[in-house]
C-alpha cells in the first residue's frame, strides 16, 4: 500500500486541523520542528539495532550508531552529565529502568505524592512502581502549597529510603535540588530527579540543573525540550553501566532509531541561542499568564509559577470540577487537562483543578500580550457558561489561532 489508508488519513487531517485551530495549553505538549517530524517518520524506522553504538547484536548499524553517538555527547554537554542513555521509549520506561538499576523489589523510596504534583511512576499504588517498591510520600505545605522540606526530612529520616525521587508532573515552583541532596546525604540515599517537564528549561538556562546534585536524572524529550516522543536518562559516569544494562536488555529490546534521531535533532536545536531565548520567553509568558489569571479571579496553586506550568483551583473558587472545566474550555477551542491539586478531595478522574502551560503556544509565537488575553477568555468561560458567551469566546480563540498559524505547509 503506497498511500495512507483513507480512514487513518481522515483522522490525520482532523488532528492537523485541531492543532491549528486550538490554543494548546496542555503543559506536557509542544510543537516539534519540521526536522524532528521528518526524522520521526524517516527510513530509520526500518532499522533494528539491539544494543549500544559499536556493541550491537545486529549488522548494518554504522549510520544509526553515528546518530546515537552524537546524541549521547550532546546530552552530556547540555546537561553536564557523566553519562547519557537516549534509548528509553518513554519517561515512564526511563523511570522503570532507573529503579531496576538501583533498587531491589521491596526497597524503600521517598517521592512526592500524586495530589501534591507527583507522577504515577513515583509510587502510585496501581502503577508498577507502587507494586514493586515500598514508596513513602512527602507533599507540600498546606499554606504555601510549596514543597515542605521539613516533611521531606521527617519522612526520609523515619523510613531510611535507598532512593529519594525529586521532580514532578504538576509543580509550578523552582525545586531546590540542593536541599534534596543534603537530606539524601543524611541517610546515605541516592537522589533521582525526574525533570520530564522542565528539561527544556534546564537546557536553556531557565531552571537550575539537577545534575549538579542528583545521582541520576530522567526526562521525557517531547515536552519543553521540544523533541520526538521518548525518554532519556542522565547520570553520574560511575553508574552508567548499571543504567545501560537496565534499559537493554533489562526493560527493552530494540531501540526506536527514528525517535532517537528526532531526540538528537531536538538536542542540536536546544544547543542554540534561539532555544535559550525560547525557554526564557516560555517562563516570561507563564508569569504574565499567572498574573492575568489571578487578576481575573482565578486561584493559583502555590500562588504562581517559576516554570512553564500553572495549576488552577477551579472547584473551590468557581464551583466547577477540573473535569467540567476541561470540557468547557475545549468547547471554545482551548485545550487543558484536569489535574489534582494539593489535598484534593475529588477523585483523579474528576479533580478540583486544571493544569495549563505555555510551552506550545510560545513555540507558536505567543508573547505576554496574547497570554493575558487567553487568561481573560478562560476566566470568562468558567464564570459564564451561557451559549452566547461561549460562542463569543470561541470566535476570539479562532482569531488568535489564525494570527499565529502552525504547520501551514503540511497537507495530507
Swiss-Prot record:
Keywords: Amino-acid biosynthesis, Cytoplasm, One-carbon metabolism, Pyridoxal phosphate, Transferase. It comes from the Bacteria. One of its GO terms (molecular function) is glycine hydroxymethyltransferase activity. The modification N6-(pyridoxal phosphate)lysine is found at residue 223. HAMAP family: SHMT. Catalyzes the reversible interconversion of serine and glycine with tetrahydrofolate (THF) serving as the one-carbon carrier. This reaction serves as the major source of one-carbon groups required for the biosynthesis of purines, thymidylate, methionine, and other important biomolecules. Also exhibits THF-independent aldolase activity toward beta-hydroxyamino acids, producing glycine and aldehydes, via a retro-aldol mechanism. Transmembrane segments: none annotated. This is Serine hydroxymethyltransferase. It comes from Mesoplasma florum (strain ATCC 33453 / NBRC 100688 / NCTC 11704 / L1) (Acholeplasma florum). It is found in: Cytoplasm. GO terms for biological process: glycine biosynthetic process from serine; tetrahydrofolate interconversion. Belongs to the SHMT family. Its cofactor is pyridoxal 5'-phosphate. It catalyses: (6R)-5,10-methylene-5,6,7,8-tetrahydrofolate + glycine + H2O = (6S)-5,6,7,8-tetrahydrofolate + L-serine. Pathway: One-carbon metabolism; tetrahydrofolate interconversion; Amino-acid biosynthesis; glycine biosynthesis; glycine from L-serine: step 1/1. The record marks 222 as: Plays an important role in substrate specificity. Homodimer. Its EC number is 2.1.2.1. The keyword GTP-binding does not apply. GO terms for cellular component: cytosol.
Amino acid at each position: 500500500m503506497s498511500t495512507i489508508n483513507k480512514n487513518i488519513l481522515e483522522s490525520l487531517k482532523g488532528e492537523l486541523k485541531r492543532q491549528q485551530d486550538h490554543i494548546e495549553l496542555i503543559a506536557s505538549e509542544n510543537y516539534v520542528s519540521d526536522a524532528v517530524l521528518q526524522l520521526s517518520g524517516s527510513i530509520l524506522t526500518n532499522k533494528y539495532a539491539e544494543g549500544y553504538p559499536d556493541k550491537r547484536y545486529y549488522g548494518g548499524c554504522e549510520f544509526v550508531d553515528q546518530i546515537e553517538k552524537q546524541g549521547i555527547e550532546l546530552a552530556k554537554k547540555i546537561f553536564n552529565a557523566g553519562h547519557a542513555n537516549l534509548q528509553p521509549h518513554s519517561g515512564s520506561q526511563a523511570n522503570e529502568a532507573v529503579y531496576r538499576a538501583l533498587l531491589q523489589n521491596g526497597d524503600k523510596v521517598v517521592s512526592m505524592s500524586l495530589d501534591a504534583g507527583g507522577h504515577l511512576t513515583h509510587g502510585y499504588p496501581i502503577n508498577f512502581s507502587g507494586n514493586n517498591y515500598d514508596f513513602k510520600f512527602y507533599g507540600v505545605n498546606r499554606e504555601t502549597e510549596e514543597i515542605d522540606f521539613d516533611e521531606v526530612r521527617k519522612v526520609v529520616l523515619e523510613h531510611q529510603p535507598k532512593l529519594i525521587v525529586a521532580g514532578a508532573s504538576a509543580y509550578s515552583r523552582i525545586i531546590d535540588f540542593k536541599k534534596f541532596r543534603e537530606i539524601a546525604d543524611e541517610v546515605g540515599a541516592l537522589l533521582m530527579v525526574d525533570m520530564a517537564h522542565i528539561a527544556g528549561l534546564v537546557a536553556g538556562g531557565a531552571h537550575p540543573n539537577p545534575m549538579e546534585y542528583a545521582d541520576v536524572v530522567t526526562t521525557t524529550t517531547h515536552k519543553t525540550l521540544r523533541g520526538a516522543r521518548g525518554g532519556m536518562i542522565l547520570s553520574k559516569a560511575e553508574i552508567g553501566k548499571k543504567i545501560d544494562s537496565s534499559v537493554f536488555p533489562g526493560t527493552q529490546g530494540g531501540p526506536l532509531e527514528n525517535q532517537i534521531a528526532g531526540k538528537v535533532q531536538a538536542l542540536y536545536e536546544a544547543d542554540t541561542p534561539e532555544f535559550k531565548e525560547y525557554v526564557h520567553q516560555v517562563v516570561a509568558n507563564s508569569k504574565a499568564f499567572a498574573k492575568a489569571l489571578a487578576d481575573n479571579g482565578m486561584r493559583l496553586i502555590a500562588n504562581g509559577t517559576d516554570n512553564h506550568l500553572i495549576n488552577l483551583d477551579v472547584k473551590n473558587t468557581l464551583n466547577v470540577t477540573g473535569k467540567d472545566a476541561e470540557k468547557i474550555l475545549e468547547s471554545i477551542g482551548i485545550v487543558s487537562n484536569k489535574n489534582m491539586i494539593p489535598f484534593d478531595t475529588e477523585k483523579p478522574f474528576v479533580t478540583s483543578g486544571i493544569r495549563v502551560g505555555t510551552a506550545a503556544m510560545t513555540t507558536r509565537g505567543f508573547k505576554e500580550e496574547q497570554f493575558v488575553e487567553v487568561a481573560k477568555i478562560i476566566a470568562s468561560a468558567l464564570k459564564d457558561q451561557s451559549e452566547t458567551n461561549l460562542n463569543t469566546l470561541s470566535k476570539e480563540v479562532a482569531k488568535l489561532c489564525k494570527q499565529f498559524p502552525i504547520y501551514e505547509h503540511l497537507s495530507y
